[in-house]
């Protein structure tokens, strides 16, 4: 879809997680986005998806108890509403429709990256224990499975704000 021009390249952050947003201590409001070395042309769904992977999960990225891992649809809804409204009508209908798939894709991609790092000796992601990246991989793939099961609800949420 990107190659045939239906999904435009946008300026994307490519590391959209909460710790890359400076928050004002007094107001609790976002001040600015940081860690700009990853900014480049990309797909909106990927930025949205990475933030959902991080922000709508019910568990930490390295949770060992996989029964705690799921995508919180309320958090997905709140974020989707803010994201779509915050884009001020700039997104195409197809870009908006692809947002849930972006969440699944980016979660899967990160799971594979954690597994690759584990298999290659844990040289890229900092680890705190033996098997840490393998735990991260399992958590991400469990989250992917849950997102796939919830895809109809995620699509319905997105349609509300389209």
Regions found by a protein language model. Name each.
Residues 28-31, 43, 74-78, 94:
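Short, well-structured alpha-helical interface segments that form or flank functional binding sites
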Residues 1-13, 18-32, 126-134, 145, ...:
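ATP-dependent phospho-/nucleotidyl transfer catalytic cores
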Residues 91-103:
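All-alpha amphipathic helical-bundle segments outside canonical DNA-binding/catalytic cores
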Residues 109-162:
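ATP/Mg2+ or Mg2+-diphosphate-binding catalytic cores
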Residues 5, 19-60:
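Catalytic activation segment of kinase domains across protein kinase-like and atypical kinase folds
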Residues 8, 13, 40, 103-108, ...:
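Secondary-structure capping and boundary motifs in well-ordered enzyme cores
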Residues 16-18, 23, 75, 96-99:
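Active-site capping/gating regions of soluble enzymes
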Residues 45-89, 105-124:
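Active-site activation/catalytic loop segments of kinase-like enzymes and analogous catalytic loops
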């Amino acid at each position: 879809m990107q190659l045939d021009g239906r999904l435009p390249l946008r300026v994307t952050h490519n590391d959209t997680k909460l710790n890359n947003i400076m928050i004002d201590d007094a107001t609790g409001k976002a001040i600015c986005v940081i860690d700009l070395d990853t900014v480049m042309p990309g797909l909106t769904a990927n930025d949205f998806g990475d933030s959902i992977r991080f922000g709508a999960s019910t568990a930490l990225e390295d949770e060992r108890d996989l029964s705690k891992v799921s995508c919180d649809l309320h958090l997905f809804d709140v974020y989707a509403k803010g994201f779509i409204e915050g884009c001020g009508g700039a997104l195409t209908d197809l870009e908006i429709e692809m947002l849930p798939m972006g969440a699944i894709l980016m979660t899967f991609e990160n799971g594979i990256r954690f597994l690759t790092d584990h298999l290659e000796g844990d040289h890229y992601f900092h680890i705190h224990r033996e098997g840490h990246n393998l735990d991260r991989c399992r958590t991400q793939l469990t989250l992917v499975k849950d997102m796939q099961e919830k895809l109809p609800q995620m699509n319905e949420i997105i349609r509300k704000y389209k």
